[in-house]
Every structure is written in C-alpha cells, then in structure tokens.
Amino acid sequence: MTTACLLIMVATILPEEPRPSETYAAQEYAAWTAKLTGAPALEIRRDDRLGDDGFRLQNAGGKLVVSGGRRGVLYGVYESLERFAGIEFLSVNTTVVPEKGALVLPEALDETQQPAFELREPLWYDAMNNPDFAARLKINAAQLEERHGGCSHVFDTVLRNCHTFGRLLPQEEYFEKHPEYYSEWNGKRRRGRTQLCLTNPDVLKIVTQKVFERIEANPKAKYFGVAQDDWGFYCTCTNCAAVDAEEESHAGALVRFVNAVAEEVEKKYPGKVVETLAYQWSRKPPKKTRVRKNVMPCLCSIECEFKNPLVRSKHSQNISFLADLRGWAAQTDQLYIWDYTTDYANFLYPFPNVYALQDNIRTFRDNKAKSLFAQGAHQGRHADFAELKTWLISKWMWNPDQPIKPLLQRFFQGYYGAAAPVVRKYFDELHALPRPEEGIGTLNIYESLYSPMMPNAFLEKASAMWDEAERLVKDDPIRSYNVRMGRLTVDTTRLQRHVDAESRWPEYQALARRCLNAFEEVGDIKFSEVEGLDELTLSDWRRIATNSFEAVSADLTLAVSPKSPILAIDRFFFRRGEKYKLRAHVRGGGFSAGVDDWDSVLNHGKRTFSSDEVEDDWRWYDILEWNVEPCAYFWFSGEELSSEVDYVQLKRVE
C-alpha cells in the first residue's frame, strides 16, 4: 500500500562514474521520499572497506550520507527509509508509507552495520521471484540483478548447491560398463536411487574432470557442488565402510573424496570453492578428517523438530543436530546452513514455527555459520504466514538480535490494518497449541494433515476469527486481499479434513468454491513439492463444488502424477462405515499399497506386489476392500524408480 502525497525533489550526490547499484540506490531514495512531505539531501559514498554488504549512515549537517560497497549503499538507503521515515516493505503487494510522513535524521547519526551472515537467502516465493523486493529486505542471493549489486555467492548453474552426484556421473552413461562406480548396497552395486563409490579412484578422476569442465564453462561462478543425491544408499563396499568406521561417520568417505577434488581444484583454479552436503546420513562430521579451506560444507536440519528452539529443545534429533552443528563449526570457517521453515507435505497447513526461528538463526550465528539458506514455500504464494516469515527471517539474517515483539507489531499492523488484532489473536492461539517434544505430534516438516495437535475445534474457532478479520477490512482492498489469502491455511485444512461432510455438505461446497476462487485469483498458489498434487486436489474441489455428496462419494477414480514412487491420498469424501474396493493402475515395478490411519498406528490392510508380479504395460491391481473409517487414508509406495501409477480407484461396493 502506498499513500499519495506531494511530489518533492531530493538533491543527490553520487560518486564519479557511479556503479549501477549506486545509481539505483539514489533512484530508490528519490522515488520513496517523493511520497513524503520532506526528506534531506542524499550523498552516496563508495567505501569498499565495508565489504559488499556493509554500510555506514551519517548525518552530515542535515544531509544523509550513505557509504558502502556494491550492495551496502542500497541497503543503507532502505534502512534509512524504514527507520527514519517509517516506510515498511512488508510484501510484494504491501508497502506502507506514513500519511504526511517525513524522513527525519537523528542529529548524532553515525553508525555502521554489517550482516550476521555473508549469504542470506530465505527461499520463499516473494523473495525468490521479485529481486527488487529481495533487495529491500537486504537479501543477497541468486536472483539479484546488477542494479542491486549482484549476487553474493554465485553457484554454478549445473553443479548447484545440492544433489549433484547424478549429474557428475550419469547412470545412463556409466552404469552398464562400470557398476563399481556406484554404491554397493546389500552386497550389490545399486542402480536407480544410488550414490557414488567414494573410494574408487576412477570416480575421483572423472568427478574432478567434470568439475574442471564446469569451471571452464562458467568462470563467473565461485561455488561448485559435489554433493550426495537426495536419498540414502551410501556406498557400503569394503573400502568405503572402512573409512566410515575409522571416521565414525558416513561423512568420512564423503569428506575425504570432496577434499581430494578440492585439492586439485585449488591447484588449477585458486579461489574456487567446492560445496558439499552434511545431510541425513552424512550429517555427523568425521572424527579425524577436516574439510579443506576451499570446501564449504552445508549442514541441513531436515530431521529436526521446529516448534522449539534448538538450544532449548529436548527432541532427540534437535539434540544430535546441535552436536553436529558444533562439530562442523570446529572444522571450518565456511559453514553453510540449510534450514527448513515450512511444511513440505502441505504448504497451506498451519505451521506454528515462528517463535523458534529467531533463536535458531541466532544459534547458527553463534556457531560460526557464514551462510544461511532458509528453505520455505518457494513454489507458490500465500503459504502459512508466508509473508510474515519471509520478512522476519530476512530481518534476523541481517541481525538476529532484533527483538520479536516490536517486529510482530509492525508487521501485523501494516499488513492486516484494522484486522491486525484479530489475526494476531489467531496467530498467538495457533502458536500456543500444545505439542510434545518427542514422538507423535512433534512439529516436523512433513506435518500430517490429520495431526491431533491441530484440533478440529480450533480450526472451527479460527475460521470465525478470519470471518471477523474479513469484516473489519472489507473496505480496504489491499488488506482485504491479505486477509482472504491469509485464511487459506484454515479454509483448505478444514476442506481437506471434511469433518461430518455428509451432514454439512452445503457448507463444504461453499468452502470449496471460496478456495477455488482464491486459487483462480492468484494463479500461483501451490500445495506441496509433490508433482501433480495441486491439480489432483483442485479437481477434487471442483467435484465437491458442483456435485451432490452422493455423486462425489460413489466413484472415486482419480488421476495422479505418473511418476510418484511414494503417494498418499486422503482427499476424498467417503460414506463413513460403507465398503469400498481399492485398486491401482500400475506398470513397471513392484509396489505396496494399503490403508492406514492418521490418528493412530492402526493399519487397515495392505498388499505388496513384487516386480515379477507387475507387468510392463498398464494394468489394474486389486488392493483390498475397505470399510471406511474417519482419518483413514490410502497409500501407494513404489519400490523402484520404474514403478509408475496413473490412477487410483476407490469404488463403493454395491
């Protein structure tokens, strides 16, 4: 939101032969202060001693002087607009400019700021897809353009920051003649989901040469990923197992391998850095071997519990992760953190992690992490409090000591306007919901849609709160939009849970239409990382919006993503207590399928088909007959990458 006011001209002094970012900083200052009633003149001074991101702010006789490096001058301008004029850059569509405001400098202003992290990348949709907005949040990641001062850490476009083994040694090129290049698992060299044999000297030669080729092809890049692929199956051959045993970690063979690549890179291309993952099976640092100075290990928090801060958590994975964090911090001055900040099973599911974010970012800073990548719902807009989390994470990546209460007050008031107290009440009650610190119900990044920690009674109450919030901003177009999109987390969860659907069918039809309208209005909302899940869900909602309960519940044949090794389907409106026949249309590989229950460990039945039983052509396979129970869901798990499913059918037995 912007407020129209008198256009004013501000005198600006730039360095001789200004950089694009210096010119852009002056343009941004002029554009935003034009919406104010007054602002001092601006002088931009180049000072590369402050690094690319650091800046200094001074009041020089009533003139604002911003000194800094490539990005620092721009960040200094935005800092001044926020602190001294009260302008709030809250989201791509919401900027608050105080009515009749002015930019007033403190008389004794003279301060220098440096960021807590060299690389700051909150991977959320607004920040990832709008470089102007990213720069206003002092984000310095890949999407920044020359006028923003460019990106701080340039990764290769092929050997990026994760999962590059398959690119370095493609199986279709090498496996047939050299299966020994790949992981030995259960006594056999594994195809499909596999890793590399990291003690094989030929693998080292090939990978090193491939890295050389990428450096030659992309000389502007500084960082080149040599990183495990996104599954287990580390090599257990005699040599790899011996190294891992000696190092007391499966990162042992990995770090020795990456060090060997990096040693050759340093000889030929000094200044280039090899990045690798400390992820899942490689998370624990090796006992004996330290990473080289030109290796950047990226420690990933994927297994953690995210409601409670790491330093106060009693969760076993958080305790072990903190130990690993300290171990890697003792090994390197280039520690890179990959943190997780949303629910990847369902971006629109309420995910109350905000009060852990600041403490965790501070913990990373205190343990010498230099780079922070916070993966969020980057695939689509309006995930659970997406705009708030993007803004807060960005603030704390710059300075994790900023207190949370004033930040929350600023954001809620600016983003939700008159509805701020009601939305804040919902936010507080959501985060106050009790959760265990261990076991079923902990807040992990694949939170169940049916988690007992998110009671239906709370969702009903939350829906009423959002109704009230909508009423309060009905005459404010921007805040009305923000509230309507904010309530999607509650609306979609209620619709997907469909409690008492048959008796409340008109209500669910209206809810389906509301959700469909929101998706149509925005166009780039996503449910999760699962391919095909968006269209699957929207198709289901269209049937709900336009059909009777009888029609929807009778025949539930549904197309799904053809390539889906693991799949759970719980989005149906069943007739409770009636019997359905389940079957799946599959080809190519072995699979298991059955029915489980979200609310308990109860298994309603399953069936497994071996690869020998599954034909290469599409065929229907009967799974079981199922008496529908509340909170039950159908699941399908392909045992091999070749296993494909394109239809699941749940047909009521007459």
State where each predicted segment sits.
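Structured mid-domain segments that build the active-site/substrate or prosthetic-cofactor binding neighborhood
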Residues: 202-205, 213, 316-421, 425
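Short, well-ordered secondary-structure micro-motifs within conserved domains or adaptor modules
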Residues: 38-59, 65
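Catalytic domains of carbohydrate-active enzymes that cleave complex glycans
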Residues: 368, 393-576, 619, 646
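Feature activates predominantly on carbohydrate-active enzymes
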Residues: 8-10, 20, 25-28, 32, ...
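Extracellular polysaccharide-targeting segments
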Residues: 525-527, 621-629, 635-654
